[in-house]
């Protein structure tokens, strides 16, 4: 196990005390909100640090007592009984703190942009993309998060060729960031008379929702085109010049949005563009920082097949951590917490292993 960073623990305690003092002094409302946010982030960590320090002090007292030859037999027996319990408590607290003190991803607390695109498999792939979107939508609903569709291109037989949505809430990106990659489905299409199993796929990308302070987009770096957009009356009825396409010239990234309001379209397209640029910057920094990263979970390679959904067997397999669950129906209803937590645990274990190697 990697050693606990004692200096970092002391610094966190010092900062927590400073925040408590500043909040008690009655600062301005905007300052108070920022302090309260940092306070709630630090509180669980500092609570564990204090519990750990208390347990270490208890252990030291017990060991001192046992070394004292003048202590009577009854007291020594009680101390010897307590010793294993205190050591076990310290070990458990050390493991918990190893996780709490891991380097934080600055984007973890952010909302996210979810992009799902049908891949190989034609109409079946589009239907599967629709199934995946509903799965994430239901998971988000259970978490109390808000889902808003930014743009959608429907498949001919249903589902989506492409759908982009924002999922708004605290910690959305932390929960969903390991969903990026190729999701494969194996099932018998409803139109298949012979009952043959077809394989199709959809690609999922989960991006942290970037704010203006996260990424700067210069006006001269973008080209905005206005296009005709279909209204409610059909393909060529009620068309308006509201659809917007924004091209980021330095990178070639293109984003479109086709809601009724041109103003809304521009804002939504800029929101997606900002998040894609922010994500590209994060990916570049990650690859430079961890070229030798051993964890498959955190690789972020969106061309990698990460999960298979086998409908005839009711089986879902996540290939990165060799996890197989026979609860496909429940997962498609949004019950993906078990997989999400297993992926996070695997990633944290790989981070801990790397920290141990560095020490």
Curated annotation (Swiss-Prot):
Family as reported in the entry's similarity comment: Belongs to the prokaryotic/mitochondrial release factor family.
Segment forming the signal sequence: none
PTM annotation: Methylated by PrmC. Methylation increases the termination efficiency of RF1.
Location (main, coarse): cytoplasm
GO cellular component, one term: cytoplasm
Protein name per UniProt: Peptide chain release factor 1
Described function: Peptide chain release factor 1 directs the termination of translation in response to the peptide chain termination codons UAG and UAA.
Pfam families for this protein: PCRF (PF03462), RF-1 (PF00472)
Disordered, as annotated region: 280-306
Compartment(s): Cytoplasm
Domain of life: Bacteria
GO molecular function, one term: translation release factor activity, codon specific
